[in-house]
A protein has these predicted regions:
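Transmembrane alpha-helices and adjacent helix-loop boundaries
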Residues: 1-139
């Protein structure tokens, strides 16, 4: 193999890696925020379900999760993945894994905000949504 052939293959792999990384961030960060809200919800079954999801995702190896996402549809539904669907399965696997980690980061950050900031927003007449997006989320 020549040097240029090797470099072309390496560049192709780098493009795939960067695209997987960017798409994983694009999907896992909002999903993690939704999971964090579910984890902090007052509705106990939802809170319990999100806690279970986070525990399973953080407690099992990523490689095992990727294998389940890749081979699971075949064994459960008889759907064989090939071509572009393999890439999609990879994005789904990484996204659901990293969403659990982002959820804990978001939850701990939100819960660390002093109560006085919520009270100050209430005095200023902010709604709960305004309080979150203008005061809590930027921190």
């Amino acid at each position: 193999m020549s040097f240029s052939t090797i470099m072309q293959q390496l560049m192709s792999g780098m493009i795939s890696t960067v695209s997987i990384f960017l798409l994983t961030l694009l999907f896992s960060m909002p999903l993690g925020l939704a999971v964090a809200f579910g984890r902090m919800a007052k509705f106990k079954p939802l809170q319990w379900l999100m806690k279970l999801y986070i525990s399973v995702m953080r407690g099992t190896p990523l490689m095992l999760q990727l294998l389940v996402v890749y081979f699971g549809p075949y064994y459960v539904f008889g759907i064989s993945l090939s071509g572009y669907s393999v890439f999609v399965a990879t994005i789904i696997g990484f996204s659901i894994n990293y969403a659990a980690y982002f959820a804990e980061i978001y939850r701990s950050g939100i819960e660390s905000i002093p109560v006085g900031q919520y009270e100050a927003a209430k005095v200023l007449g902010y709604s709960r949504v305004q309080t979150f997006f203008k005061i809590i989320f930027p921190q």
